[in-house]
């Protein structure tokens, strides 16, 4: 990822190396709690049903507690009966956002911050990208995460 805009002194051109061509897709998936980002996973390639189910069973479910609520958007990979069953077996409740409502998804705000961080670090190799993602996840404070939920109009009641 690279920044699309930059600054330079008046009269000088802003120059920075930017990769060209279409690179590989890297997908990040994670969960957001009031305390911070949790259950992160990076996947080479696009998200699909089998990959999301593996994420839920192997990464997300071990972090869930009875009574937790798992909010997901309407990606087809999220709607698998096996995903629902795995979440419910952990004592958590799966819920889906209304269609076309990213403003009600607090993790979208966190993803925006993470993407800005990744553009700033300008990682050019897969290993550097994975390291940058790990460093970016650690920048989320509990107060900031609580504010994401407040901005998405969630409350603790």
Question: Where do the protein language model's features map onto the residues?
Answer:
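Short functional hotspots at interaction and active-site rims
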Residues: 1-157
């Amino acid at each position: 990822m690279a920044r699309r805009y930059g600054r330079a002194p008046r009269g000088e051109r802003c120059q920075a190396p930017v990769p060209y061509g279409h690179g590989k897709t890297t997908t990040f998936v994670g969960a957001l709690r009031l305390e911070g980002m949790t259950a992160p996973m990076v996947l080479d390639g696009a998200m699909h049903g089998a990959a999301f189910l593996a994420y839920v069973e192997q990464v997300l479910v071990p972090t869930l507690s009875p009574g937790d609520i798992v909010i997901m958007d309407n990606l087809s990979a999220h709607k698998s009966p096996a995903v629902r069953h795995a979440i419910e077996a952990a004592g958590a409740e799966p819920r889906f956002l209304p269609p076309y409502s990213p403003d009600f998804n607090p993790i979208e705000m966190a993803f925006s911050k993470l993407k800005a961080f990744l553009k700033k670090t300008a990682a050019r190799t897969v290993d550097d990208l994975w390291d940058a993602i790990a460093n970016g996840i650690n920048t989320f404070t509990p107060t900031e995460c609580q504010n994401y939920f407040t901005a998405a109009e969630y409350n603790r009641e």
